[in-house]
Design a protein with these regions (language model features):
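Exported/periplasmic ABC-transporter solute-binding proteins
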Residues: 20-45, 51-53, 58, 62-68, ...
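Gram-negative bacterial Sec-dependent N-terminal signal peptides
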Residues: 1-19
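Active-site phosphate-binding/coordination module
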Residues: 93
């Protein structure tokens, strides 16, 4: 009897393995919340599990160069996926836009942020969280915005700099800075701020934050990887979910 139960258990394990597959995905920090929901939707629909790691695109690039077994990268920019393909680390022709990010000046304090370009220079704002523009596209967009406003030089002494947009958001969230230039997706859902107060920066003040996905060499020819990317790109519910976090498509 015990032998039969063991055989049934082993059969069940192999059956599950045959019907489901794990997909290793590296995801830019700004896309954390949407990816968690997309993963849950996809797993429910297919049984395939998304094993997502979240962090800085630059850090993922370094890991990928060192042989990390990620199959897909959802980057915070378009430059990194293009570089990955050029260097032979990714599959040619698979890098494409999955979302366009938006910048917001945000504070954890309700009714604090004013829609005024000189607000960041006011005495109310002691520290401003900004991502490193050399490492993070949202940091680059913040610098472009303040350059357009003409107040970058005066604002710089107030900067608290994060290596990526995740750390930058934490600075603003924990009041290490009164305000921060962060990704709209970190503080926005279904048409409104989820907490605090913010000013969605007009998109004509900075270059479009195009975010590309790319299939990495470990994911080449993998049917489950291709199916997941098709789901993200074409499924109406998936597209609606991404837009609900303030992204453009």
């Amino acid at each position: 009897m015990k032998h039969n139960l063991l055989l049934l258990a082993v059969a069940a394990i192999f059956s599950t393995s045959a019907n489901a597959a794990d997909i290793n995905v590296a995801v830019a920090a700004n896309f954390t919340a949407p990816m968690k929901e997309l993963s849950a939707m996809y797993e429910k629909e297919t049984g395939n599990k998304i094993l997502a790691s979240y962090g800085a695109t630059g850090a993922f690039y370094a890991q990928i160069k060192n042989g990390a077994p990620y199959q897909v990268l959802f980057a915070a920019d378009a430059k990194t996926p293009a570089k990955i393909v050029k260097e032979g680390l990714g599959v040619e022709g698979t890098n494409k836009a999955y979302a366009f990010g938006k910048l917001v000046l945000w504070s954890a304090a309700p009714d604090f942020v004013k829609e005024d370009k000189n607000f960041i220079l006011s005495d109310k704002v002691k520290k401003i969280a900004v991502a490193n523009p050399k490492l993070a596209p949202y940091g680059e967009a913040a610098y472009q915005t303040m350059t357009a406003w003409g107040n970058l030089k005066n604002a710089e002494p107030k900067f608290v700099t994060g290596d990526n947009i995740g750390k930058t958001f934490q600075y603003a969230k924990t009041a290490n800075a009164q305000v921060g230039f962060v990704a709209l997706s970190q503080v926005f859902k279904d048409g409104k701020m989820t907490s605090g107060s913010g000013w969605i920066i007009p998109t004509d003040l900075y270059q479009p934050i195009r975010q590309d996905v790319v299939v990495l060499n470990p994911g080449k020819g993998n049917k489950e990887v291709a199916d997941f990317l098709k789901f993200v790109e074409t499924n109406p519910q998936a597209k609606k979910l991404i837009e609900s976090y303030g992204y453009g498509l």
